[in-house]
Amino acid sequence: MATIVDQAKAQMAKSVESTKENFSGIRTGRANPALLNGITVDYYGAPTPLKAVATIGVPEPRTLAVTPFDASQANAVEKALRDSDLGASPRRDGNVIRLTMPELTEERRKEYVKIAKGKAEDGKVAVRNIRRKAKESLDKAIKDGDMGEDEGDRLLKELDKVTKQTTDELDALLETKQKEIMEV
């Protein structure tokens, strides 16, 4: 029956990873290739993720360099970057498209912090749902006689401990992200 807690722990770890991934798409003062994850390019008529049609590098702290694999698609890549809501205008430099990230205003930083808080809360909701399902499984096992009350109580305490550790980890991630965003 400890497998119920182990499964919950694994699912909570996935939730933390998902939250980290979501955080990587939120802009900070620095250029980060993950900012371009949601951008799709009209590649020969088919919407294709940018990272599938170009390499993305960070030559300078506030600059992203996007190099299409196929030079003939540079215009399509540039158009996709221009149409995105990054707030940066692409500059062509031969086959390389450079995106210089503008400094974030205080208002925009606060907006990004708000988005980060929302994503962290989504992660916490997922963790609470995982805990609830695991608790229901433990309660059912006790009711069906598959485990004793004492064993169930011990596993529930372990589940609560794992849940608290995970929510604390999400809080720490949020705090770190907030500092990154507010850093001038």
Swiss-Prot record:
Location(s) in or outside the cell: Cytoplasm
Pfam annotation, one family: RRF
Major subcellular site: cytoplasm
GO MF, one example: ribosomal large subunit binding
CDD domains to which the protein is assigned, alphabetical: RRF
Gene3D superfamilies, alphabetized: 3.30.1360.40, Ribosome-recycling factor
Alphabetical list of SUPFAM superfamilies matching this protein: Ribosome recycling factor, RRF (SSF55194)
Keyword Protein biosynthesis listed: yes
GO BP, sorted A to Z: translational termination
UniProt keywords, alphabetically: Cytoplasm, Protein biosynthesis
Keyword Transport in record: no
UniProt superkingdom: Bacteria
InterPro entries per record: Ribosome_recyc_fac, Ribosome_recyc_fac_dom, RRF_sf
Function: Responsible for the release of ribosomes from messenger RNA at the termination of protein biosynthesis. May increase the efficiency of translation by recycling ribosomes from one round of translation to another.
HAMAP family the UniProt entry points to: RRF
Similarity comment text for this entry: Belongs to the RRF family.
Protein known as: Ribosome-recycling factor
Lineage: Bacteria, Bacillati, Actinomycetota, Actinomycetes, Bifidobacteriales
